[in-house]
Amino acid sequence: MLIYSSKLLKLSLTEGGPCMKIAIMTDSNSGITQAEAKELGIYCIPMPFTIDGKEFEEDINLTQEHFYEKLMGGAEVFTSQPTIGIIAKKWDEILKTHDAIIHIPMSSGLSGSCQTAMMMADEDQYKGKVFVVDSQRISVTQKADVLDALAMANKGYSAQEIYDYLTNNKMNATIYVTVDTLEYLKKGGRLSPAAATLAGLLKIKPILTIQGEKLDKYGTSRTMKKARKMMIDQVKQDISDRGWGDDYEVACVYSYDKEAALDYLEQVKEAFPDKEVIFDRLSLSVACHIGPGSLAVAAYKKGSY
């Protein structure tokens, strides 16, 4: 079931008719499922995983439940990126029925898939037909870009205009994440074993942020309760500093522990009483690096086109 506001989805799905037939394409890092993609009329490439030496694709033969069962059971889980062949095959298929493709992968700072797609789009057979947007976003903010692109295509904007808008708008988003365990940051090399051990002994909860490109450290807290409040406070500060006024959306996002996430959702709603707070799960590729029990709050400026 789609979790975005009915007003936004109505705009995305029904308004206007494009002069060009433009396809919108993304990957499952956006949190968009195959069912949601079909409902929206877009294309979503599943991200590949290797679990104990076996290959899987997110939302194809790898469910959230199966993924967390393996991850929490100690399986060796690795993320990967779609092959050039898979991307090229999908582009070729789409271009048989469309004039252009807007391709919105996850941030180039978090995966090589964006750079690979950008190099492919520069080849003669795709130049001027495939527009790869490095939106420097992931999860709900990447999904917001997809919905903006779809709405613009349905309003009649050209592929170049959509690409330019998304590129210029990429920094109008903010995400803060806190993790329940440091184990997965250590496994992924984002935290040294010594630092992870010390932080664990001190019961420190790190807060991470995505402000364009990479996942970076923002701060630390001694309790999850304080970390939750710090994230909300900083999102509010970012909204104020960037002058968004009331022209923004807020989201509460989580990995695995829905009960804790629903509790945090109420806290986010209290902090933003005039907003319809979006509630969503983190994509598996993000969860793989930060682990189950993670909570995040995000905000992004509403589309203006």
Indicate where each model-derived feature is located:
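Short, Lys/Arg-enriched N-terminal segments with co-localized hydrophobic residues
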Residues: 2-19
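N-terminal glycine-rich anion-binding loop in soluble enzyme alpha/beta folds
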Residues: 23-81
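Class I S-adenosyl-L-methionine
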Residues: 55-125
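Mixed-charge interfacial surface used for oligomerization/domain docking
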Residues: 17, 23, 29-43, 48-50, ...
